[in-house]
Amino acid sequence: MEDNYQLITKTAAGLEEVLVREIKALGAKNVRPMHRAVICEGNKELMYRINYEVRTALKVLKPFKNFFAKNPDDLYNKVKEINWCELLRTDQTFCVDAVTTGRFFTHSQYAALTVKDAIVDQFRDVYGIRPNINTLNPDLRISLHIREDKVTLLFDSSGESLHHRGYRKQVDKAPMNEVLAAGLIQLTGWKADCNFLDCMCGSGTLPIEAAMYAMKIPPGYYRKQWGFMKWDDYDAELWQRIREEADAKICDFDYEIWASDRSPKAVAIAEGNINYAHLQHDIHLMKKDMHDLTPPEGGGIVIINPPYGDRLEEDDIDHLYEEIGHTLKHNFQGFQCWLITDDAVALRHVGLKPTAKIPVWNGPLECRFVRFDIFEGSLKDKKAREAEENN
């Protein structure tokens, strides 16, 4: 049986606890959260499963070397001491991605170039030739992490970031990252036990991720390539078994998933993505402004990703948020509504009292994922009903 080793799975800031739950559900041991990552112990099977089945994973990294370095010369010499000829062939390609923090290495790109130089110089010394660099689709992607003087070299088993699911063929402006969308859905606590609505769907990422979650479609279902497929120890039989076991869990969904947007361009793009994912019979897509929407009966979850940051002129923001609040209050009674925004001032114009605020990051933007419970009748009536039920 294969020995366990350490795995580091990266995610977006704010989704660490969601990622912990997903990885624990796969049977990982010694799982603990870090900043934008989760560390655990596992084997090749777990590494494959995280890559294929975990919705909030961006990268799955396998550490292989730790050492200390306080300057570029130290880094170069320590990297060159590693026998890269056992890890890479001259006819293969590689690249180095770097993340650095602390006072010793302040430029991540320079640190990555230092590691690259050490590797190719070793090959020149031994063979007189060197492997080439390929930043798009290398045979081996090396991840360099430096915190102060502590250096970790890791193999990137994912290759292209896992938020590239494979179903999104077109995007509208400023599309939501698929991993963030999957994380927001899980942060709501939705268990696929009621309706799901996205009233500003843009490219359709949130409703597609909701359908995949509800129907247990693995996040890697539409994807073709992973970094570990080019490793010498790639186990195609194990990978095939893992995919078949995960795909066998795909099921139907008994409630409604609605997606709408007032932009004809956005709806056309969303339609193309939904069709490519073969979810056109599972997602009800329409071109309709939010305030004209009559939601399905029975309540449910609403997630709204309104234009913000560079997506909207400042003069329009306050009016948009006022309109959102008015529409939620009058049209979405009985729904639990969530809104993601980076604009705390505009958020006050919703005019509803939040029942939860969760900090998350949407790329470089620090945001809040805010919950509004839209009661049927007044809050006073709801509390009176709850008091009667408890007596």
Give each language-model segment a name.
Residues 2-138, 390-391:
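Non-catalytic nucleic-acid substrate-recognition regions in nucleic-acid-modifying enzymes
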Residues 11, 261, 341:
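Short beta-strand/turn micro-motifs composed of small residues
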Residues 49, 54, 160-165, 169, ...:
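Flexible, glycine-/basic-rich loop-and-beta segments that form/coincide
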Residues 101-104, 161, 307-311:
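A short, flexible beta-alpha/helix-coil linker loop
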Residues 142-158, 370, 379:
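C-terminal edge-of-domain segments
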Residues 154-187:
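SAM-dependent Rossmann-like transferase core, predominantly class I methyltransferases
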Residues 176-295, 310, 318-320:
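Conserved S-adenosyl-L-methionine
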Residues 289-292, 296-391:
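C-terminal catalytic and target-recognition region of SAM-dependent MTase-like enzymes
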